């Protein structure tokens, strides 16, 4: 019988992994989360009467200094509702850096569901659009230019370049350009709490520079599912309408919202541990394979590895690591590893042992060639 699904080969062979570094989305609920889920007070989110969902939305909005929040199943849905909120209909243009989640994974979603197109810029290894680039995009090329930018979208941390943090002063500069042009700013803050932990800047201070933002409960914070879109109270009704329109109105969603409350409360406190382990992992891989890791790029919980030094194709290296019990994936032509709630020091040791074995095999192959 045929099945609907996506075949990802070794990227999906989780049962064989001793340590799973593919993403911070692979975490299992903690015991506290499981208890909270079992005991959650629930209602029907479609009718807006699930008390646990409503409490989660309120606390998430408070955490980032916004007035209202909408709990939805995925980060993609949160972003798409957030973008759509700013437009009355289709036919709008959004400025953003190339390679962001919204301009890659979600690019066709925006086109199909909201009639939104993107004007992208090459942000290079930093990953974010800067104020000068934003100003250039907002300036019409000619008098009758129909390609008018209606919104600027940013991401923090920037996953495509290894979880780099957009400096607050850079975000403020982009916000000023947007304000001067009268256009809003939306933040894909899937890992905003990682950005806050790494920079020492409160998440609410980052969020103050944007009109709307979303963040994931199911990435670094460790919840099993869910993201929250946050913004001003006067957008809350329309956000709820779009949530229903996009199929995001849950039923007894308090069951998963209960885990989200624990993730929101406890998750940010321990993100620095993920960052420290990512640094240790990066330094170890760089030692085993000199030149394979740009340590200056390792700011949060991601490590990108250039496999050129291995002398084997990237996908072959991923399969070899999987055979050694280490789950990894790839991004931008490099192997990507992400530390998270379920990766401890022992797991980092397992990963480093695998990389050292890989490096030793390359040396041995070179000696016998």
Q: Which functions belong to the PLM regions below?
A:
Residues 4-296, 300-324, 328-343, 351-369:
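Conserved PLP-enzyme active-site core in the AAT-like
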